[in-house]
Amino acid sequence: GPFSPERTGGLPCGDLVKLCFSGKYTLAEMKKKISGKGGLVAYLGTNDAREVQKLIDAGDEKAKLIFSAMAYQIAKEIGQMATVLKGEVDAIVMTGGVSYSENLTNQVKEMVSFIAPYMVIPGEDEMLALAEGTVRVLNGEEKAKIYENEVKL
């Protein structure tokens, strides 16, 4: 998938394997490089889209390129999903903290709005989603999912 403020997104597997076995990094360091120190953090030293926009506004061409690459990857992922949905897409909804960036959301909109209606709902609602899921389990509407055999690195 696309890179995000702190996650790398898709990577070339061969290069990743070489890096893992280079002896330069511990397992914990590699995990942090992929999630936490990847994405915008790896490229620009920040996970804050507002800071990236300030860099762009100040004429930083690298920041502009990285932000455009992020928009491109997001749009590409949306296009891939539209394909497997056989074009039956009701709407495209941009969410999360980066959705506060009009620059980013407008770039994505330009590339994908032909697929379906496009809307932006900025912010993160992970805690609300967890709470609502818990209520559904407590009300007997869903069964709790137990992840006993998840992969541990």
Enumerate the predicted regions with their spans.
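Glycine-rich phosphate-binding loop plus the immediately following alpha-helix
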Residues: 1-46, 54
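Adenine-nucleotide phosphate-binding core of ATP-dependent small-molecule kinases
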Residues: 32-86
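Active-site proximal loops enriched in glycine and acidic residues that flank catalytic Cys/His/Asp
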Residues: 56, 93-97, 122
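Short, surface-exposed connector motifs at secondary-structure boundaries
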Residues: 85-92, 114-117
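Glycine-rich phosphate-binding/hydrolytic loop that grips phosphoryl groups
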Residues: 99-100, 119-153
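A glycine- and small-aliphatic-rich helix-loop capping segment at beta-alpha/alpha-beta transitions
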Residues: 107-116, 141-143
